[in-house]
Design a protein with these regions (language model features):
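Alpha-helical transmembrane segments that form the membrane-embedded catalytic/substrate-binding core
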Residues: 106-114, 142, 146-188, 214-234
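Cytoplasmic-side transmembrane-helix entry/capping segments in multi-pass membrane proteins
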Residues: 50, 69-80, 103-106
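Membrane-interface helix caps and helix-loop-helix hairpins in membrane proteins
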Residues: 38-43, 65-68, 91-101
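Membrane-interface helix-boundary motifs at transmembrane edges
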Residues: 61-73, 128-134
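Membrane-helix exit/interface motif
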Residues: 84-96, 120, 124-125
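Aromatic-anchored segments of alpha-helical transmembrane domains
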Residues: 28-33, 80-90, 148-152
Length: 234
């Protein structure tokens, strides 16, 4: 006798075959990388693999528990984005080797999250148990706000990971000029400008960079700005 859940699962796979194939292939790749990382005692890479597997599960979790039916194309884009960000970006060092990889991903993230937020609001407005409706303009605003909120929460996550696990998810930026109140010799609450910075010395050792090392602020603000652009484009 065929189990009813197996029959239902088979129908879902047949209905969403492109999504299932994409999910299965990417998940297999990540699991293999995870196993290799554990054998090599590379626990930071293993952390990124586990994070990727968790993020892969989010679209299915939202569909199952909240009734949010995502278009197949959008779901494939989400899976591809997660793989590109964590596996290609972090483990394969695309953030360092491919110019603007981080900027491109955060722009796409803004677009995808706005689309996801729009689907969520649309489903809520169609729910007969909820007595509210939104005009298209307010739905667009809600989708935009949802996208920006996800962008901010992701930056919180990156900051927390850097502080707790010693990662460097908030990438560094080399600057040649800074403005600082702390470095004002008079102690007044006015910024002093330091320009044409060419070297940075830490504990008497010169760092191999041609300027001052910003450890995440510029990267975070740039990420939020391009997330904003992606959300507005949607």
């Amino acid at each position: 006798m065929r189990h009813p859940k197996f029959g239902e699962l088979k129908k879902q796979i047949k209905k969403n075959k492109p999504v299932f194939i994409t999910y299965a292939v990417l998940r297999l790749i990540v699991v293999l990388i995870l196993i290799r990382s554990l054998f090599r005692a590379d626990y930071q890479s293993a952390f990124y693999c586990v994070l990727t597997l968790i993020l892969f599960f989010i679209p299915a979790f939202m569909e199952k528990n909240f009734g949010i039916v995502l278009p197949n194309t959008l779901e494939i884009f989400i899976l591809g984005f997660v793989f590109a960000a964590e596996i290609l970006g972090e483990l394969n060092c695309y953030y360092l080797t491919i110019p603007h990889w981080d900027t491109m991903l955060h722009t796409i993230n803004g677009f995808l999250c706005a689309a996801f937020g729009f689907c969520l609001v649309d489903i809520l407005t169609r729910n007969k148990n909820l007595k509210f409706s939104l005009s298209p303009i307010y739905m667009a605003i809600a989708a935009f706000c949802f996208s920006m909120t996800i962008g901010v929460l992701w930056e919180f996550f990156e900051f927390s990971a850097d502080c707790i696990f010693g990662t460097d998810m908030q990438k560094d930026t080399v600057l040649t000029a800074i403005n600082s109140v702390t470095l004002n010799p008079s102690g007044e609450n006015s910024a002093v400008s330091i320009k044409n910075i060419t070297t940075t010395v830490v504990n008497g050792e010169r760092l191999p960079i041609d300027g001052y090392l910003d450890i995440g602020l510029f990267d975070t603000m740039k990420d939020l700005m391009v997330n904003f652009v992606g959300a507005v484009v949607f």
